[in-house]
Amino acid sequence: MPSMRVTTDTWPRRAAQEPLLLLLLRSSLMKSASLQALNPNRAMAAMGRSVRVVLDSSVLLDPSGVTAEEEEVVVALRPGAEALLRRLRYSNLRVAICHPEGLTTNESGFLEKTAKLYSFGYMPLTSPSGSNLLNELMLEWSETNFCFYVTSGVHEGLLSELQNHNWEVIAMGNEDVIKNSGVIHISMLQELLITLATSIKKEIGNSSAFVVGYVMKQSREEDFAKRGAFPIYPSKNDLIFVPLSFELPLASQLQEVDLVLHKITDEIINIDPNSSISFPKGISFSPGMSEIIRFVEEHCDFCVIDPFKNIYPLLDRIQIQEILIRLEGLSAEGRPKLRAPCFLKIESFCGSELQKQLAEAKLSFPLIVKPQVACGVADAHNMALIFKIEEFSNLSVPLPAILQEYIDHGSKIFKFYAIGDKIFHAIKNSMPNASHLKSSSGGKPLTFNSLKTLPVATKEQLLQNEVQDSKLLDINLVEEAAKLLKELLGLTIFGFDVVVQESSGDHVIVDLNYLPSFKEVPDNVAMPAFWDAIKQSYESRKQMTQT
């Protein structure tokens, strides 16, 4: 968010405004007392009710914005505030930003725009209109009896009023500033989310509620969060999600959560190309992920979804092929053949025996060339489609690599997702048949990144395929494969891609991955399945460690 400049430093005036805030709050809180008496058991009442979080401007605005030369104040969010607000936006908590009377127009305007940007409530506590607004809000909130007030330092009288009416107060900063024993203290803004999560679990008092700490790259987290995957307010099956922060001591965070959901491949720094691919050998993880791995190794009863050793095979396309070959036993008379694509591992593109090796592997052109490392490094998805052996020269695909048959599949790919015990699938447009690709290649290898620049069939090519008598997908066969894969892999959530070969009707599994986005599955179906899968996996693993 862009910063704003104002000409007057208003921070010294904040303390003088606290008595006004206290005055405005008192009348509303007194009116709510009788309603609270009707519902004294807050722990039992918490589930199914809203959780409110009021963020005082003091925890959001950066107090160090004065420039000595210009004597101006830069109105901006303090470090860590933007990430906090982004996560709170999709937390299912009801959040409001408040500020006392006395801020400049630029400061209050900045806060109002911030609240609007993140879809939060905005509460300018000014008199007289602010009093009426606050009265109305407090009367409404009194029915929830589950509110947090977050500040970096307030009037002691205000704290007492809030606590007398069952508000939780979280104060950031030096504990010596606030002597009130009932205040929850945090030293950094990054501690707020895990503090909220553990406080909510404590207030619920429900033994079936679990705190899930999660680790993944920011873009993936945001994609999941926007779909409602990571609520801090408990999900329908009592899961509370909170991101693990590498800016804070991890050991203390891991002691506060019940389990960790991770995308370990997001935290790979490097894979040594000179080491034999026998993961985790040769993998360098981020310092934070390395610490989590050590913690899990030292605490064998700690639950991670999924165990690291179960995921390592999916980093290697050779191991993926070997896993898929084990599914071929599902094929039977009267059913399509289920198989992995024919493949060959190569260490060099210049070998004199390459033509012979291709024949022995039953491979013919065109071929897809893929790096053996399947994910976690920048070039893992750099691939090529080649149409003759001469095109191997000067190929830029990383080695070692696998050569895989290209399957004409009518430009349709079936994406399957196993989420716990539930299996979903979606149909997507895919690469056109080889004849179309060859005509557009210009006699050169067709290079692409499978995540970014995958060549997809044109509308005309899709229409041609629709007219053709395409083979139908055997859903039952693929679902059986999904169940067997779940047993073989020991994974809670995974995905795989199936294409149906036009010439034979063979069902060929061409890709396998851990914790996919499953964005093709509607959120109202996917998210409950996602939460159930996590909880069932956790309870199953805990039961195993206790026996």
From Swiss-Prot:
Binds 2 magnesium ions per subunit. Disulfide bonds: none annotated. GO terms for molecular function: ATP binding; inositol-1,3,4-trisphosphate 5-kinase activity; inositol-1,3,4-trisphosphate 6-kinase activity; inositol-3,4,5,6-tetrakisphosphate 1-kinase activity; magnesium ion binding. It is an enzyme of class 2 (transferase). Mg(2+) 1 binds at D497, D511. Keywords: ATP-binding, Kinase, Magnesium, Metal-binding, Nucleotide-binding, Transferase. Residues 327-539 form the ATP-grasp domain. 1D-myo-inositol 1,3,4-trisphosphate binds at K263, H381, K415, N513, S517. It catalyses: 1D-myo-inositol 3,4,5,6-tetrakisphosphate + ATP = 1D-myo-inositol 1,3,4,5,6-pentakisphosphate + ADP + H(+); 1D-myo-inositol 1,3,4-trisphosphate + ATP = 1D-myo-inositol 1,3,4,5-tetrakisphosphate + ADP + H(+); 1D-myo-inositol 1,3,4-trisphosphate + ATP = 1D-myo-inositol 1,3,4,6-tetrakisphosphate + ADP + H(+). It comes from the Eukaryota. Its EC number is 2.7.1.134, 2.7.1.159. Its cofactor is Mg(2+). Kinase that can phosphorylate various inositol polyphosphate such as Ins(3,4,5,6)P4 or Ins(1,3,4)P3 and participates in phytic acid biosynthesis in developing seeds. Phytic acid is the primary storage form of phosphorus in cereal grains and other plant seeds. Monomer. Belongs to the ITPK1 family. This is Inositol-tetrakisphosphate 1-kinase 6. It comes from Oryza sativa subsp. indica.
